[in-house]
Amino acid sequence: MDVLEIMKIIPHRYPLLLVDKILEMELGKRIVGLKNVSVNEPFFQGHFPGYPLMPGVLMLEAMAQVGGILMIKSLGLEIGKYAVVFAGIDEARFKRPVYPGDQLIMELETISLKKTISKMKGTATVNNQVVAEAILMAAARELESIKK
């Protein structure tokens, strides 16, 4: 699945769209996504000048976006009508830095998936080395319901 298809499913846009491609997907079970980490990412301007590292919270957000795609597709939710929002994060660990030029591969495996709530185990790797992992909980909400 390419980025244009991804943008039909989740509402995230630049500079917070953090998934470029879906490589694999088994509905209700697992998904694998890819983020090409460019030196031009806006977060590198301040994290850290001269020593660019991808912030850990953005690795979690990237995993969550990939998991959100799996959730929306698996539950058969109407495309373009829902956003998946964080409900919780457990056991987050950051193992290695992510640099400009890296390809961040994110694999999410479903632990539970019910109605509009999910729990997934996420693992992010670069060059087959784990850089981050976490248990992510999320809720699907109609976009209209999250407006102020």
Swiss-Prot record:
Pfam families: FabA. The active site is at residue 47. It is an enzyme of class 4 (lyase). Keywords: Cytoplasm, Lipid A biosynthesis, Lipid biosynthesis, Lipid metabolism, Lyase. GO terms for molecular function: (3R)-hydroxyacyl-[acyl-carrier-protein] dehydratase activity. The keyword Lipid metabolism applies. Its EC number is 4.2.1.59. GO terms for cellular component: cytoplasm; membrane. Involved in unsaturated fatty acids biosynthesis. Catalyzes the dehydration of short chain beta-hydroxyacyl-ACPs and long chain saturated and unsaturated beta-hydroxyacyl-ACPs. Belongs to the thioester dehydratase family. FabZ subfamily. This is 3-hydroxyacyl-[acyl-carrier-protein] dehydratase FabZ. It comes from Hydrogenobaculum sp. (strain Y04AAS1). The lineage of its organism: Bacteria, Pseudomonadati, Aquificota, Aquificia, Aquificales.
